Regions:
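A ligand-binding cleft/hinge motif common to bilobed small-molecule-binding domains
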Residues: 89-91, 226-243
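Extracytoplasmic ligand-binding site segments that recognize negatively charged/polar headgroups
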Residues: 41, 78-79, 83-206, 210-220
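Early extracytoplasmic/lumenal segment of secretory-pathway proteins
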Residues: 24-91, 217
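Periplasmic-binding protein-like
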Residues: 194-202, 240-264
């Protein structure tokens, strides 16, 4: 999910006697972890090795598609744990590349926040465990804004004319417009999507700028008083100005999830289960969450992590942007093109 809207972590403590099933390479025991660079603090990997005698071999990929290609070529083997984005997890499961989880081997699975479970890519949570969540949110300067912003619908308030900075993701901006209308972010009905476009055009007078990179800077330098930001941008903005106000929109969250799974032919499934359970231990999950800067998926770790990375308990609605039909996507793109032109 490193490239998207979007993410966080989990853990548990295993006794040394559990690890009798690990493969041996001489006296060495290894677990091959396949994910993006920078997803774990070295301290966590080192502590796992100290506790279990299993060395974590960190193998990186640059895109989800690269991961899927390599895992497919290996026929679900070579790697013991994979962490990737929600949409590619669906494909990996459909292609038979993911192990159906033995929940009895995961003592700490109950630590996972139910808000991020039962998603489209794994509706019964049979194959994956959420690791991190990216959540774009509204952030504003209460000293510069005269209204109390509670949701997406408030972005249309006339008092916010020429004051909003938006990220540049066409599906996400269409999506929050749909949520403000009581519709799904993944609406397929072209007529409804056209109405979304009409509503979006009404927002144009309030938009100061649209950009994907460092959007938070417009809020920090005073160019904008309200911003809709990706997770990393939210945390960066709050680090610079802790007096900014973060809004968890009352219409619900749009988010992207990074999930972890055990490949169907993983060389060492015992090691994989042990690592997965280990990082669902609250203290370990908190270290991982603070390190990667995505939102926490581990409710047992919430009190231990940076409070800016914990979604409030009263937020119970969320939706992931999914692929839609070609006709629906074409209308979403048309909405976006017309909206950007109106903002110029």
């Amino acid at each position: 999910m490193k490239k998207r809207v979007l993410a966080v972590v989990m853990c548990a403590l295993m006794a040394g006697s559990v690890f009798t099933g690990f493969k041996d390479a001489g006296d060495d025991k290894e677990l091959v972890l396949f994910t993006w660079e920078g997803m774990f603090p070295q301290e966590v990997l080192d502590d796992f090795e100290k506790e279990t005698g299993v060395k974590v071999v960190y193998s990186n990929f640059d895109t989800d598609e690269t991961m899927l290609e390599k895992l497919s070529m290996a026929k679900g083997g070579d790697y013991d744990i994979v962490i990737a984005d929600d949409y590619i997890l669906e494909t990996a499961i459909a292609d038979g590349l993911a192990e159906k989880l033995d929940k009895d081997s995961l003592e700490n699975i109950g630590n996972i926040n139910s808000l991020y479970q039962g998603q489209f890519y794994d509706p019964d949570d049979e194959y994956t465990v959420p690791y991190g969540v990216g959540i774009p949110l509204i952030v504003y300067d209460p000293e510069q804004v005269d209204i109390d912003i509670k949701g997406y619908k408030d972005l249309w308030d006339p008092s916010l004319e020429d004051s909003i900075a938006l990220t540049a993701n066409y599906r996400v901006i269409n999506g929050i417009t749909q949520l403000s209308m009581g519709e799904s972010m993944n609406e397929e009905d072209v007529d409804v999507i056209k109405k979304t476009g009409e509503k979006l055009l009404e927002l144009a007078p309030n938009v100061r700028l649209i950009q994907d990179d460092n959007t938070q800077n417009a809020l920090l330098n005073g160019e904008a008083s309200v911003a809709f930001l990706y997770t990393s941008q939210v945390t960066a903005a709050l680090a610079e100005n802790p007096d900014l106000k973060v809004v968890y929109p009352e219409e619900g969250l749009g988010f992207g999830i990074m999930g972890m799974f055990i490949p169907s032919e993983a060389p060492d499934k015992d090691a994989a289960y042990s690592f997965m359970d280990y990082i669902m231990q609250p203290e370990v999950a908190a270290k991982c969450t603070d390190y990667i800067g995505y939102y926490s998926t581990n409710k047992a770790a919430d009190e231990l992590v940076n409070p800016d990375l914990v979604v409030p308990d009263d937020v119970t609605k969320g939706e992931i942007v999914q692929n839609v039909s070609q006709d629906a996507d074409a209308q979403y793109q048309k909405n976006w093109t017309e909206f950007k032109a109106a903002c110029d």
